[in-house]
Amino acid sequence: MACHFARWVAAEPEPDTHRLPPNVLLSARSLSEKQRKRFLSGRVLLAEMMFYLYGITELPAIITLPSGRPSFESQNLPDFSLAYAGTTVGVMLSSEGKVGLDLEVIHARSALINSQQQAQLSAVEQTWIALQSDPVESALQLWCIRQSMLKLSGLTEHGEKSLSLNPASGRLRSAITPEAQVMSDIDGSLTWACAHSPAIARLLCWRYSPESGFTRTQTLSIQQQPHSPHFMKFTSLPPAK
């Protein structure tokens, strides 16, 4: 099953909102200027993806699930995940299964992730980080991977202990989502992680701009992986007995 991951550096003062319904524009009015731009940019990118991939001209109705996770109201529409890092907006979409996306700006973290976040890492994860040539970068990439899985599972607030990663073997175990796969890479100062349940057959990566629309940058799969030294792939271990 194919997943789509699109990024947009939203440098425009105001995004073009012609594909957004009136209720979305109304909801944005109560937000601060920074929050409003992020909110609208994320939904503009989602709306443009829905038009580009499925021919849907206006963003469908979105609800908030009890977990706090946004979702299309219609269960017949794709699952999606939104992420923001600096001026970059990201959307991940899949017509099958569930998705989770996270983006992090590397230069925004001048030190290792804080002590509270480090406490959520297993000894295996901390040992792997310490052995890397750039522990700051490696710690942030692992954190990004964790966040994508937690967003997939709807557990961004209190689900840290439900997930363990083994970076050396590329395996993960989630108590909430027993079948999942994650792909992650570092692109310049940005690290990204795309999680999908049950598995990523193909990940189609796109860049978006209002002027040129969508441009496919790469297609990733089990057989077709980038030469990037930072690319990581995690696959679920069987549930612990």
Residue spans of the language-model regions?
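Conserved nucleotide-ligand handling architecture
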Residues: 1-241
